[in-house]
Amino acid sequence: MSLLTEVETPTRNGWECRCSDSSDPLVIAASIIGILHLILWILDRLFFKCIYRRIKYGLKRGPSTEGVPESMREEYRQEQQSAVDVDDSHFVNIELE
């Protein structure tokens, strides 16, 4: 006899738990924690690049450019953009001789 037939059996209304302790507060808390863990894991996998960049570089966009000439600001923006573009690439070309 399998574990599935001992614990849960399909009925016409859906899956029914045959455990007598299913109303135990510990079981309910464990179920809620499990569901929250699953939701957080899914969100982490969906937004990991955004989340970890935010942690790594902080909430600021970069160092302050107050008092810096506009030409240097533009050069800095281009450098930062090229660094982000390189970081987003998923493949590296390796040429063998």
Swiss-Prot record:
Site note Essential for channel activity, possibly by being protonated during channel activation, and by forming the channel gate and the selective filter, residues: H37
Intravirion-side segments: 44-97
Activity: how regulated: The M2 protein from most influenza A strains is inhibited by amantadine and rimantadine, resulting in viral uncoating incapacity. Emergence of amantadine-resistant variants is usually rapid.
UniProt topological domain (Virion surface) ranges: 1-22
Residues that span the membrane, as ranges: 23-43
Annotated region (Disordered), positions in chain: 60-84
Domain of life, per lineage: Viruses
Places the protein is found: Virion membrane; Host apical cell membrane
Lipid addition sites, S-palmitoyl cysteine: C50
Modified residues (Phosphoserine): S64, S82
Gene Ontology cellular component annotations, sorted alphabetically: host cell plasma membrane; membrane; virion membrane
GO BP field: protein complex oligomerization; symbiont genome entry into host cell via pore formation in plasma membrane; symbiont-mediated suppression of host autophagy
Keyword presence, Isomerase: no
Entry keyword Ribonucleoprotein: no
Site (Seems to be involved in pH gating): W41
InterPro entries to which the protein is assigned, alphabetical: Flu_M2
Membrane topology field: Single-pass type III membrane protein
Further information: When the channel is activated, one or more imidazole moieties of His-37 probably become bi-protonated.
Biological function: Forms a proton-selective ion channel that is necessary for the efficient release of the viral genome during virus entry. After attaching to the cell surface, the virion enters the cell by endocytosis. Acidification of the endosome triggers M2 ion channel activity.
Quaternary assembly: Homotetramer; composed of two disulfide-linked dimers held together by non-covalent interactions. May interact with matrix protein 1.
Domains as described in the record: Cytoplasmic tail plays an important role in virion assembly and morphogenesis.
Family per similarity comment: Belongs to the influenza viruses matrix protein M2 family.
Protein name: Matrix protein 2
Species the sequence originates in: Influenza A virus (strain A/Duck/Germany/1949 H10N7)
Gene: M
